[in-house]
């Protein structure tokens, strides 16, 4: 785990689900309670398209969940299903080696990332911004700081808090996302002149930015057109280490 006292030159604040990894934030629930899969998929699509709030999504999930997800249940899911897009762990490690603070900023659950860190499935993540609906007792393997994210707009608030804490200038910020749920984060990023990267860009993010005249500075991976469904085979051919040259040019 990276120290909170380390000096960083820059920051990347990135979404996780379908941005760095081919999963939804609720897959661990579907794994343990398969009967909820269809309803969970519908909720995910609704809030990433900005049709319902994240708070409303969390309320609906709490109501349908038979019991809280235990650490053992989360571990069983991770042992069976954890994956990222190719090159993501290496990219995180590369960023940290260049003194770039890598912050995962997601509507996913804090407990999911706590168990990922405990099992050593990713390099030490210094900062995490995630929903606390599933969160476990603190361990030494946890990110040194976990910001609570209750609504989509909290992504921007938590990134802003991180750059103030680490005294990172606006021209050293990259925001990365894939869907309309990242729209408010991109909107804030545009206001502070951050560099905006669409990763596996969905129409909902394209439309959000288009209607607000927000320029996505760089698109990486497979951009999905309005009529296209997810093509996991193509997505898994994208190597995220190829993004390092863009990051180096922008931040270093």
Predicted regions and their residues:
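Alpha-helical substrate-recognition element adjacent to the catalytic core
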Residues: 2-131
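C-terminal cap/substrate-recognition subdomain and adjoining C-terminal extension
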Residues: 86-90, 97-101, 108-252
């Amino acid at each position: 785990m990276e120290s909170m006292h380390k000096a960083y030159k820059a920051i990347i604040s990135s979404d996780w689900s379908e941005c760095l990894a081919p999963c939804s934030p609720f897959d661990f629930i579907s794994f343990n309670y398969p009967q909820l899969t269809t309803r969970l998929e519908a909720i995910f699509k609704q809030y990433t398209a900005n049709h319902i709030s994240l708070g409303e999504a969390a309320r609906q999930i709490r109501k349908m969940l038979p019991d809280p997800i235990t650490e053992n249940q989360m571990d069983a899911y991770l042992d069976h299903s954890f994956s990222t897009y190719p090159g993501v762990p290496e990219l995180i490690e590369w960023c940290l080696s260049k003194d770039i603070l890598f912050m995962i900023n997601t509507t996913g659950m804090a407990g999911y990332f706590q168990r990922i860190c405990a099992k050593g499935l990713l390099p030490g993540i210094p900062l995490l911004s995630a929903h606390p609906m599933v969160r476990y007792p603190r361990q030494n393997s946890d990110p040194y700081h976990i910001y609570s994210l209750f609504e989509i707009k909290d992504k921007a608030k938590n990134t802003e808090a991180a750059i103030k804490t680490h005294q990172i200038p606006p021209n050293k910020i990259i925001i990365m996302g894939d869907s309309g749920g990242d729209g408010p984060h991109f909107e804030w990023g545009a206001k502070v002149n951050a560099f905006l990267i669409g990763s596996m860009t969905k129409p909902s993010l394209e439309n959000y930015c288009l209607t607000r005249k927000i320029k996505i500075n760089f698109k990486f991976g497979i951009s999905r057109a309005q009529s296209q469904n997810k093509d996991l085979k193509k997505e898994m051919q994208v190597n995220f280490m190829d993004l390092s040259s863009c990051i180096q040019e922008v931040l270093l």
